[in-house]
């Protein structure tokens, strides 16, 4: 599904099971880090306008300096202090190289199909990252008839969010519809379905302030109970499976946690090997 962390999982696989990122890839991510900073600032400003949150200082509504004008001397000390901050110095240094965590947290929309190959023991894995947005799905749904397993990612934290491409559609409802169509598709009749309910760290914080029942009235538990809310969404996906021969293997994940992903992917490998032995 869109905005679920698929690309982050693929990055983790490169870090855990491959040789990591080559210099050309790291340089590309360096540019993306800077782009994400600008995008984030723009989103904050747009959100303030949408929510009608005024700036504390009305003078910030219009720039006090026009192009070509020098900065007033009163800005010197604050800018000097900001520039001296170790984090800022690291990021904007000409020798700045993104760390693994920087790369994992970079955001760039996936378009088309991106393949990652890595070796795990005697096995060679080919993983395909596909765009999750509606416009991307028609490009890949028919391409994977013979895959060993489908790793389906959904952002469990998106239960109260709308789609990027459709502000009137709920992310979780959309993910449920997509999972239903893939799980029961003619292309994946004999394919193992591994479900990653991702961004569990964000979900844990969200339920404290955003009631699940507000968006899913059929939830009858405690809105702030982590175990009850996660179980509710896990069961929603599992119940969509219409085949008695097919198992759904759910996992709660945080795609930026390398140690957690290493452990979970060990379990996924066991599932895939078991499936292969069954098919012999």
Language model segments and positions:
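Switch I (effector-binding) loop of TRAFAC-class P-loop GTPase G-domains
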Residues: 20-39, 94-122, 136, 279
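Switch II (G3) loop of P-loop NTPases
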Residues: 119-140, 158-162
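P-loop (Walker A) phosphate-binding loop of NTP-binding proteins
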Residues: 1
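Conserved GTP-binding G-domain of TRAFAC-class P-loop NTPases and closely related GTPase folds
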Residues: 70-75, 79, 85-103, 108-114, ...
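Conserved glycine(s) of the Walker
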Residues: 4-5
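P-loop NTPase motor core
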Residues: 8-96
């Amino acid at each position: 599904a869109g905005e679920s962390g698929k690309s982050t999982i693929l990055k983790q696989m490169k870090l855990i099971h491959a040789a990591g990122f080559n210099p050309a890839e790291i340089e590309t991510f360096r540019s993306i880090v800077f782009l994400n900073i600008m995008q984030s600032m723009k989103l904050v400003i747009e959100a303030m306008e949408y929510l009608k949150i005024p700036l504390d200082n009305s003078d910030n509504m219009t720039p006090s300096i026009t192009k070509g004008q020098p900065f007033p001397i009163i800005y010197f000390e604050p800018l000097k202090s900001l520039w001296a901050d170790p984090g800022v110095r690291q990021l904007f240094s000409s020798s700045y190289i993104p760390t693994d965590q920087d790369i994992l947290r970079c955001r760039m929309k996936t378009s088309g199909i991106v393949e990652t190959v890595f070796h795990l023991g005697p096995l060679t894995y080919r993983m395909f990252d596909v765009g999750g947005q509606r416009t991307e799905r028609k490009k890949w749904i028919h391409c994977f008839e013979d895959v060993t397993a489908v790793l389906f990612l959904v952002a469990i934290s998106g239960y109260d969010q709308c789609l990027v491409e459709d502000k009137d559609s709920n992310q979780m409802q959309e993910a449920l519809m997509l999972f239903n169509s893939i799980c029961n598709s003619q292309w994946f009749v004999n394919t193992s379905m591994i479900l990653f309910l991702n961004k569990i760290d964000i979900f844990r914080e969200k339920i404290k302030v955003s009631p699940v029942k507000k968006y899913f009235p059929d939830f009858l538990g405690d809105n702030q109970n982590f175990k009850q809310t996660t179980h509710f969404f896990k069961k929603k996906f599992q119940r969509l499976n219409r085949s008695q021969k097919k198992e759904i293997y759910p996992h709660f994940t945080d795609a930026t946690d390398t140690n957690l992903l290493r452990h979970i992917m060990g379990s996924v490998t066991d599932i895939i090997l078991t499936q292969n032995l069954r098919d012999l």
